[in-house]
Amino acid sequence: IGFYLRLQRKYLIVLNKLMKKIAIIGGGISGLYFANILNHQKNFEYKIFEKKDNYNFLEGYGIQLSVNSIKLLNQIEFNKFQNDKKFNPDKINFHSIKSSEKICDLNISDFNTKDCKYTTLKRSDLVNFLKKDLESLIKTNYNISNIDHKNQKIKLTFENKENAECDHLIISDGIFSK
């Protein structure tokens, strides 16, 4: 048994050297999507650093997802998402902002496939779907203040005085990026 424990310890040391550390800055849709993709990879260790201190989203904030985005989301089992929380419209109507008259419509169902359909849903429902298996990897209240790159390592410093080191950095902090 001692031999196997030493062998296992050596294996873990080698594996740890080979395992790449990834820091994902931003716990929104793109950061969470990327983290879900990494969940299927065994040679990456990662954490998600979100500057907000919580995930409180307004329930009524809706988003639209194109067929192409649904194709990507289906890679992380979005096709198993609750049907009663999403809607697949057939067309979009365009109206004049001045007169409210209809200008035209677009039959978006023409772009649908059997597995990928134009979809609308609440942003909060999509975020909850994306973060459901990642809760322990999300660090909230981590606003980045400095990025330093030395000796093929990236050192992150946060406003809360915490530090993190990684091999790769994914910055997906949205439209309010610094």
Where do the language-model regions lie?
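Beta1/beta-strand and adjacent pyrophosphate-binding region of the FAD-binding site
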Residues: M19-G28
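Conserved N-terminal helical subregion
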Residues: I22, I37-N39, S66-K178
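Proline-glycine-enriched beta-turn/loop adjacent to the NAD(P) cofactor-binding site
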Residues: G28, K52, D173
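N-terminal Rossmann-fold NAD(P) dinucleotide-binding loop
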Residues: G31-L32
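Glycine-rich FAD pyrophosphate-binding loop
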Residues: N39-E59
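Conserved N-terminal glycine-rich FAD pyrophosphate-binding loop of Rossmann-like flavoproteins
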Residues: N54-L72
